[in-house]
């Protein structure tokens, strides 16, 4: 259920309800080999763009055609210019299809876009910017429409999150385990849902392993006890 963002259940509602007024949230995504703990995850929003043009024979009546693909190609160039990797503003036009044959000026084009953002503010900025780009007409006689929806919200790095990480680190040191390292990553997790309701959250506290989502995936079983001990003692130390 989690891997498809709980589209078939009310898990998100349950997570937020149960976490309401909690002091902190520890999320048990798989741990990392070098003791990294996730303090920030990017949010996602996808867009499905459909462009309608006018078909025509590319040899006999080229002047009658209005290429949806040319309109789409220009949009892709403009959309990709919006990327600002350093700020955590990512736009990927990852899918494009259109036309029916090489001797027909294409009257259809579809573009699939996935965006990622470091903060909710940047997410709103992306939405505004993409709407502005998609309102442009590069090929007269074409029409551009789109649908959009939020995937997983951003798990934002805040002072409260780093306070929770520091507590984890102190407990970890007392237990004699290797030093924890805070990292920020692009992939999402359920940690976003508790972050959204302002609960200090850290992620990737599960059993340590590698190669997720592949046939090489494995877990270092001995670390399961270490992570249980770390989580239990951290909860005990919460104010």
Where are these regions (language model features)?
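Acidic/histidine-rich catalytic neighborhood of metal-dependent amide-processing enzymes
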Residues: 1-40, 239
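Metal-dependent amide/peptide-bond hydrolase catalytic core
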Residues: 30-39, 46-50, 54-239
